[in-house]
């Protein structure tokens, strides 16, 4: 049997794919940078070998799965190609692998990781389900009937997939280093829609999704009356959210989620609609929704003294806004403090005013230096450009986070897609 070698095994898609193959009986190893990344914990728990990059890692009899971030000139990939060892790109491998299951792609500008995690959790309570989540979580079951996976629109990678079902949470302009404008993003989703084989579950409240053309039924969900699956009578409190679901204006059932904010109601509606389409018992759906513990880096809370520290991946103005909204629902009488690290210079430049507007919804704002991704080295702007747009915003450095102690019973939300967790960990050390 071949050994699967992952070039870039700590990637948020690569790590869960390695976990899935390992769980289903394959021999798996991989290589990556030596810096610790949160996605490696699940690999280490399975004793999956993680090696430093080295062309000598490549041996006869292997199949190389290459991460999207690594060009054909990467030393390991070069070695494999020169020795005739098969090299398959991550998204191509995944596209072929999923064909042996009833598979569901979850895509959208925002909410796809949380929705993938929620759907995997609910489906597992009904049928054997394998899943791949963009928070680095993956699980393979040998007898799986379903495969639930997160599909990213960046660089149109999701066009490698021809899923049975697609959940589309929303369309928004992001990844300005690749997409030129919202029309370019819409075009990518439109092409994806034409590749779906059974049905699309799409948010009808979204500005763009109702314009999607498809060869299969499109089932819409949302708060508005024209949706096929509609949430009504929404009751929010500090314990979570309860809502009624109407299917084409007929009462279906009442659901409770231990989650906050309208975006989590919408994510749940998407899952309810898909499960209804697959004839999963409503009592199973209701029960599983109440026990979902969330996904990594999405509103993860930790109590430190009188403060609550929240770690969240929010890195787009829309995501910042809904994260602050969720915190206000759960902690209506507490001070909300945003600690934000912008992710990539191109995104910060593109959305400078929108970032300022969304962050102003917090009571206090602290800004970390911009995190440049592997895709770019230097930008034309600095964090000062954002600070100037937010009155009273302060800059904060990893070396000195003690200023946050002033917010004695505050809700501190650390947001960003870079290494904002460094700031959170630094503050934890001085907080008590």
UniProtKB/Swiss-Prot annotation:
The protein's annotated pathway: Cell wall biogenesis; peptidoglycan biosynthesis
Keywords: ATP-binding, Cell cycle, Cell division, Cell shape, Cell wall biogenesis/degradation, Cytoplasm, Ligase, Nucleotide-binding, Peptidoglycan synthesis
GO biological process, one term: regulation of cell shape
Subcellular location: Cytoplasm
Broad class of where this protein is predominantly found: cytoplasm
GO molecular function: ATP binding; UDP-N-acetylmuramate-L-alanine ligase activity
EC category: ligase
Entry GO CC: cytoplasm
Reaction equation(s) it catalyzes: UDP-N-acetyl-alpha-D-muramate + L-alanine + ATP = UDP-N-acetyl-alpha-D-muramoyl-L-alanine + ADP + phosphate + H(+)
Annotated PANTHER family: UDP-N-ACETYLMURAMATE--L-ALANINE LIGASE, UDP-N-ACETYLMURAMATE--L-ALANINE LIGASE-RELATED
UniProt family annotation: Belongs to the MurCDEF family.
Function statement: Cell wall formation.
Entry protein name: UDP-N-acetylmuramate--L-alanine ligase
Naturally occurring in which organism (per UniProt): Bacillus pumilus (strain SAFR-032)
Gene it is expressed from: murC
């Amino acid at each position: 049997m071949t050994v699967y070698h992952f070039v870039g095994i700590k990637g948020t898609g690569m790590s869960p794919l390695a976990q899935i193959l390992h769980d289903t009986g394959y021999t798996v190893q991989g290589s990556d940078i030596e810096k610790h990344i949160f996605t490696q914990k699940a690999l280490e728990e399975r004793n999956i070998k993680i090696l430093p990059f080295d062309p000598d890692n490549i041996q006869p009899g292997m199949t190389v799965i290459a991460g999207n971030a690594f060009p054909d000139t990467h030393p390991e990939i070069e070695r494999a190609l020169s020795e005739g060892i098969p090299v398959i790109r991550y998204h191509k491998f995944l596209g072929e692998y999923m064909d042996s299951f009833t598979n569901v792609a979850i895509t959208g500008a925002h909410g796809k990781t949380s929705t993938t995690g929620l759907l995997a959790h609910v489906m597992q309570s009904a049928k054997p389900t394998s899943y791949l989540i963009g928070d680095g979580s993956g699980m393979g079951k040998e007898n799986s009937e379903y495969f639930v996976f997160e599909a990213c629109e960046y660089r149109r990678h999701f066009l490698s997939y021809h899923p049975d079902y697609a959940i589309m949470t929303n369309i928004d302009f992001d990844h300005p280093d690749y997409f030129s404008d919202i029309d370019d993003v819409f075009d990518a989703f439109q092409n994806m829609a034409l590749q779906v084989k059974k049905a699309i579950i799409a948010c009808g409240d979204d500005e763009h999704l109702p314009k999607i053309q498809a060869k299969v039924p499109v089932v819409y969900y949302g708060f508005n009356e024209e949706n096929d699956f509609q949430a009504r009578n929404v009751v929010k409190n500090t314990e979570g959210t309860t809502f009624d679901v109407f299917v084409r204006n007929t009462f279906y059932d009442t659901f409770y989620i231990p989650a906050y904010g309208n975006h989590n109601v919408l994510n749940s509606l998407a899952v309810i609609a898909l499960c209804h389409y697959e004839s999963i018992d409503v009592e199973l759906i209701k029960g599983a929704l109440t026990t979902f513990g969330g996904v990594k880096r999405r509103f993860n809370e930790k109590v430190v003294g009188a403060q609550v520290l929240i770690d969240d991946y929010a890195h787009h103005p829309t995501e910042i806004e809904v994260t602050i909204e969720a915190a206000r629902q759960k902690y209506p009488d507490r001070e909300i403090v945003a600690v934000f690290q912008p992710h990539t210079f191109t995104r910060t430049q593109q959305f400078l005013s929108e970032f300022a507007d969304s962050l102003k919804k917090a009571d206090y704002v602290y800004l970390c230096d911009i995190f440049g991704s592997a895709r770019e080295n230097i930008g034309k702007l600095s964090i000062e450009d954002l600070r100037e747009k937010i009155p009273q915003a302060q800059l904060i450095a990893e070396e000195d986070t003690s200023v946050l102690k002033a917010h004695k019973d505050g809700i501190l939300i650390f947001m960003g897609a870079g290494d904002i967790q460094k700031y959170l960990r630094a503050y934890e050390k001085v907080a008590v």
